[in-house]
Amino acid sequence: MAPPSFFAQVPQAPPVLVFKLIADFRDDPDPRKVNLGVGAYRTDDSQPWVLPVVRKVEQKIANDHSLNHEYLPILGLAEFRSCASQLVLGDNSPALRENRVGGVQSLGGTGALRIGADFLGRWYNGTDNKNTPVYVSSPTWENHNGVFSAAGFKDIRSYRYWDAEKRGLDLQGFLNDLENAPEFSIFVLHACAHNPTGTDPTEEEWKQIAAVMKRRFLFPFFDSAYQGFASGDLEKDAWAIRYFVSEGFELFCAQSFSKNFGLYNERVGNLTVVGKEHDSVLRVLSQMEKIVRITWSNPPAQGARIVATTLSNPELFKEWKGNVKTMADRILTMRSELRARLEALKTPGTWSHITEQIGMFSFTGLNPKQVEYLVNEKHIYLMPSGRINMCGLTTKNLDYVATSINEAVTKFQ
């Protein structure tokens, strides 16, 4: 008699929520359907957009017969790593001037987070210290919890961030949680365009946050997925990270080029490491090299070449900034148009938070019953939390979406 399958006891895992939402949208035959769940940019025709500068650079790379398909170094394409770190830290960064910055090319922002988490679990504040508390914002991108948990951290906590009543930042709660966190705790911070709320601290609020973190010896691990994409201004979107560096912090920053280059399926990321001196950064990179070797061994070249070529060429860099601003401006327009329509309809509640938030996502404040009504009755797909992707809005569906939200809020207050 044959034994049962070795996998007979494997339970069915629940689907990843955002991808389940996309599948449900795809299978829905209703012509009115609107996808506000997708985590990617869309044009006003609801289509993906390949940036014109990316098309140009892809052709340039294809025509360069000196390039080949040999393995990249374990830590990645050197030009990409340096360009990526320079982009987030700025040309005049004291850390760059003092040669105490390193970079690790990764498989997207998630890969950068994972390499950083694996390193911290092995080497942060001692060796194999996985009992160090890791704090993530409440709410946060769901992968933050999963990545640090998979890296072996046993004490993952949340810090207060979103004030549901005022639909804005809970600064006092945030500061109190910083004050009460054990010294040397790790804090995952969103550099800009907080996901899912779209609500960021002001520069003055960031200064207060940094002051407490400095006094309490807390380690900042920034997640920068939207530089340039949030406000349309590369410098503004990196302000918090640069301020922390100017204050003498050692820190990690996970960078993603999925959104601001539109390179979603190329998986282009970088982990920027800022240390106190050159030698310590070299030692950190030597350990990260070991981690990468047993994780993906060597990163892919195409996306990194596209980013490095663009960032290192002044003309292409200028064109890219224009492309990024095109995306950011469309999102800002959709925010103001949605708010205007809801206010014109006299939809119950206040809607100013829609234009006060920035980036791809808006935390609408819609409750679960309202969301359920929108999905089931109106075929408008959004996350159960009420988070919507502003890129899913177009001049063609704005009226329908606003009217539907008005109905949902009026029916289920």
Swiss-Prot record:
* Positions with a binding annotation for L-aspartate: 39, 141, 195, 387
Q: Which residues form a coiled coil?
A: none
Q: Which cofactor does it need?
A: pyridoxal 5'-phosphate
Summed up, the tissue specificity of this protein is:
Expressed in liver and kidney.
- Tagged with keyword Phosphoprotein: yes
GO cellular component terms?
axon terminus; cytoplasm; cytosol
List locations, semicolon-separated. Answer: Cytoplasm
Q: How does activity depend on pH?
A: Optimum pH is 9.7.
On induction, the UniProt comment says:
In liver and kidney, by glucocorticod hormones. Levels in the liver also increase 2-fold on animals fed on a high protein diet or during fasting. By hypoxia during cerebral ischemia.
Supply one GO molecular-function term. pyridoxal phosphate binding
Residues bearing N6-(pyridoxal phosphate)lysine are: 259
Documented EC number(s): 2.6.1.1, 2.6.1.3
User: What does the protein in this record do?
Assistant: Biosynthesis of L-glutamate from L-aspartate or L-cysteine. Important regulator of levels of glutamate, the major excitatory neurotransmitter of the vertebrate central nervous system. Acts as a scavenger of glutamate in brain neuroprotection. The aspartate aminotransferase activity is involved in hepatic glucose synthesis during development and in adipocyte glyceroneogenesis. Using L-cysteine as substrate, regulates levels of mercaptopyruvate, an important source of hydrogen sulfide. Mercaptopyruvate is converted into H(2)S via the action of 3-mercaptopyruvate sulfurtransferase (3MST).
Q: How does it assemble?
A: Homodimer.
NCBIfam families linked to this entry: PRK09257.1
Q: This protein is called what?
A: Aspartate aminotransferase, cytoplasmic
Q: Which organism is it from?
A: Rattus norvegicus
The record's gene field reads: Got1
